[in-house]
Regions:
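N-terminal Sec-pathway targeting helices
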Residues: 36-54
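Hydrophobic alpha-helical membrane-insertion segments, chiefly the h-region
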Residues: 54-65
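Structured segments of extracytoplasmic/periplasmic soluble domains
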Residues: 83-90, 113-116, 207, 218, ...
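Collagenous Gly-X-Y triple-helix signature in extracellular proteins
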Residues: 154-404
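N-terminal targeting leaders characterized by basic, low-complexity, disordered sequences
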Residues: 1-32
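Short, surface-exposed interaction loops/tails
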Residues: 2-4, 124-158, 374, 378, ...
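Conserved hydrophobic/amphipathic alpha-helical signal-anchor segments
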Residues: 63-103
């Protein structure tokens, strides 16, 4: 009897355990099923989104292939330039042969069936009619390629000199751009003539009669040296000789231009491609001279130079002070953007009254002369070619002209 009760109790206990286990199984099974369904639903949604994105990509790709890509103006100019380089590799007999000479090829020729070096401009720029060409010029035994794009009112490649003149109204007094001796000359102490090159800021001194642009460093960094330190027979010691052609300064400027100095760098290769040769005026001048047209200094000059120094007349013309007349006038320090306070720097003009003195801008900002063997800062001048294009900028120190 007791055994019967035990068996019944064991059976009830076992059934109770089975019921509890079943309840546990049912409770734990429900969340697992929900997670699985959610995972499958997420995968399905992800798959649908991925499929939609693939379809969109294919549609865009097909549209690009069938309709053609709409390039930016800068990209079109680069396409023009690259095509012209390939063109002249084939037609090298058409390249300019002499220094300064130019040759050009238009976009129609580059895109023609004969060459197929680029797509027609109509397929590169949509909803705008454009004409284009590339001018190649031989400068310092290198070929410089300049693309021109004219899309009417929408866009037009603009040379820097044109932009400078358009942004700086010609004035006859005060700060600004003046017409002097057939050139456009910046004068005054507050002028918007900053240009950004790879190594720093430069100032535009003037735009020449053939639209080239004379630059001088704003002098963020500098290098000092003698103008010349040779033995001078007239003076009886190594005071230097004030003739530019055989001077130490000429050698130093060549090293600066070629970037051969270890602790000073003025230019990058991309900057040199924008420069052109010029006549460097090296004529001597008296302290009392009042002719500031450049005729005195340019009575003697070196042609085909890539680097030089500022002339005395160019510095004098930078001042708007009416009393700045002769070479050593102290008034030339007034209203003159070329002045750098507490900084003395060499000019390219030598004194005409002896064989050892050269003019320099002293720490106060007016001209004095000293032995060529003196130590002063070198502030080189460079000439931007007239085909250099502007990318942006207003010419201010904070927003300088940026070149293409």
């Amino acid at each position: 009897m007791f055994n019967g009760f035990r068996n019944i109790g064991k059976k009830l206990s076992t059934e109770g355990n089975d019921t509890q286990q079943e309840n546990k199984t049912n409770v734990s099974a429900t969340p697992t099923s929900d997670k699985e369904r959610a995972r499958k639903k997420l995968l399905k949604v992800t798959g649908i989104i991925s499929a939609i994105l693939v379809v969109i990509f294919i549609v865009i790709l097909l549209g690009t292939i069938l309709i053609g890509r709409n390039y930016t103006y800068d990209q079109v100019e680069q396409i023009l330039k690259n095509a012209a380089v390939k063109y002249y590799q084939v037609q090298d007999v058409l390249l300019p042969t002499n220094e300064g000479e130019k040759s050009e090829v238009d976009a129609t020729t580059l895109a023609s069936e004969d060459y197929k070096l680029m797509k027609p401009l109509a397929k590169l720029k949509k909803n705008v009619s454009c004409a284009g060409k590339v001018v190649v010029q031989k400068i310092n035994n290198e070929y410089i390629y300049t693309p021109y794009l004219d899309c009417g009112k929408s866009y037009k490649t603009e040379e820097l000199y044109k932009s400078v003149i358009s942004k700086n109204k010609v004035v006859t007094n005060g700060n600004g751009l003046y017409e002097m001796n057939g050139e456009h000359v910046f004068r005054g102490d507050k002028v918007n003539n900053y240009v950004k090159l790879s190594k720093g800021l430069f100032r535009i001194v003037k735009i020449t009669s053939d639209n080239k642009i004379l630059l001088i460093p704003a002098l963020e960094e500098y290098y000092s040296d003698v103008w010349d330190d040779r033995y001078n027979l007239d003076m009886g010691y190594s005071s230097g000789i004030n003739l530019y052609r055989p001077s130490r300064m000429r050698d130093m400027l060549a090293n600066i231009y070629s970037d051969k100095l270890k602790d000073f760098s003025l230019l990058a290769d991309v900057d040199r491609q924008k420069l052109t040769t010029f006549s460097f005026c090296i004529g001597k001048r008296s302290a009392e001279e009042e002719n500031n047209t450049g005729a005195v200094e340019c009575a003697d000059s070196l042609d085909n130079q890539m680097i030089g120094l500022l002339s005395a007349s160019d510095y004098i013309n930078g001042s708007t002070d009416a009393n700045c007349k002769n070479t050593v006038s102290k008034s030339c320090q007034n209203y003159n953007y070329l002045k750098i306070k507490n900084t003395a720097w060499w000019l390219g003009t030598a004194a005409s009254f002896d064989t050892n003195d050269v003019y320099y801008v002293n720490e106060d900002g007016y001209l004095l002369y000293s032995n060529a063997s003196s130590l002063n800062i070198i502030r080189p001048t460079l000439m931007l070619n007239n085909n250099v294009m502007i990318r942006s900028g207003k010419g201010t120190e904070s927003d300088p002209f940026i070149l293409k």
